């Protein structure tokens, strides 16, 4: 697959994202909606963008790595959630489940889930948004509880994997910024059903 970049776009490397969400039609990713600020040079105004370019594979992969966090935060995968996540290799239970970190994200427990977006608030919190496809084929929309990425005071009730969640969100932010800058997946062009000669 060939991914493309547009030229002549503003530099989004310094954009401060507040929301990123896949736009989907009939179960297919068709674009990305984002809310962000570009900083002082642009008047520090909140901007929005909705593009109908297909998201690039690196962005989809980065969002896919958030799936275990969505599952754990929403308590959708109880048989794994209390045992830990792939980076907790000191846990014998996890060692028996996971060969490598990459294998962890493709575990069958996560196959029916999709992270479609996330949003930050002005107090340093984040909310993950996603879906679970039920055995009936229907879709259950999931919104994870808000988590403070850098709590000022620890209460013991924080999500246990905040460091990894923050790292993965930064990777997603980078990929969304590249998308805003023009990087996208291959465009799907519908072929004509009839040749021009056949229409005559």
Language-model region placement:
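OB-fold ssDNA-binding interfaces and closely related basic DNA-contact patches used
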Residues: 1-123
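Polybasic, proline/glycine-rich intrinsically disordered low-complexity segments
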Residues: 197-200
